[in-house]
Design a protein with these regions (language model features):
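Active-site beta-strand-loop-beta-strand hairpin of nuclease catalytic cores
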Residues: 71-91
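Surface-exposed interaction regions that form or flank ligand-binding interfaces
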Residues: 1-63, 90-91, 95-192
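Short, mixed charged/polar active-site loops
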Residues: 63-65, 76
């Protein structure tokens, strides 16, 4: 941080918008990602005791991670939070937009991590959800309708509580055995 702010300069708030804007592109992306994760974690944590959340969950040998695993009335969901600094949309089952790198595949990565974590924990995820800031998505939400990642959702952060209450698809239903799932996940989960 000192490389672009200046040596010997006191930094009161490292998330000050002026400092963030002056940072190199890669650092700006990491800061935006961290802020998006924090905002989503705070939102889910405020939903009440009907929800259990695990943050920064390690998958496999630790090469993959899921930002948030949420168990609630609508089932077990894998969430990742992102802020690409521009509007994004769903195209051919993947997130695309000016801020999304060509080799970046958020839905495919999250779905892969959720399937792998599900096998490790002996549970099944109801959906994979990519959460973006409200101004980062033109539609309230978009859902992958077909293909390998069918059911995955790209959603505005403000609508996440509604999704967590109602679920993504009537066919999936909630977890009637949520205490069993919670116990299984809690006993086997590993954190980054």
């Amino acid at each position: 941080m000192r490389e672009w702010v200046g040596r010997g300069v006191d930094i009161d708030d490292p998330f000050d918008p002026a400092i963030v804007r002056s940072a190199p592109r890669e650092v700006r992306r990491w800061l935006a990602k961290a802020q998006a994760e924090e905002a989503t974690a705070s939102l889910v944590a405020s939903l009440g005791i009907a929800y259990t959340i695990w943050n920064d969950v390690a998958v496999g040998d630790g090469g993959l991670k899921i930002d948030h695993v949420v168990l609630g009335p609508s089932g077990l969901l894998a969430l990742t939070s992102a802020d690409w600094g521009d509007t994004v949309r769903l195209r051919k089952g993947e997130v695309e937009g000016a801020g999304v790198a060509d080799d970046e595949k958020p839905i495919a990565s999250l779905s892969k991590a959720a399937r792998r974590l599900g096998r490790e924990l002996g549970v099944r995820f109801s959906a994979s959800v990519v959460v973006v800031p409200d101004d980062g998505l033109e539609q309230p939400y978009e859902q992958v309708e077909r293909g390998r990642h069918q059911g995955a959702v790209l959603i505005r952060r403000s609508l996440l509580p509604q999704l967590l209450r109602s679920g993504t698809d009537d066919r999936l239903g909630g977890y009637g055995e949520s205490f069993e799932v919670r116990t299984r996940v809690q006993s086997r989960v590993r954190f980054v």
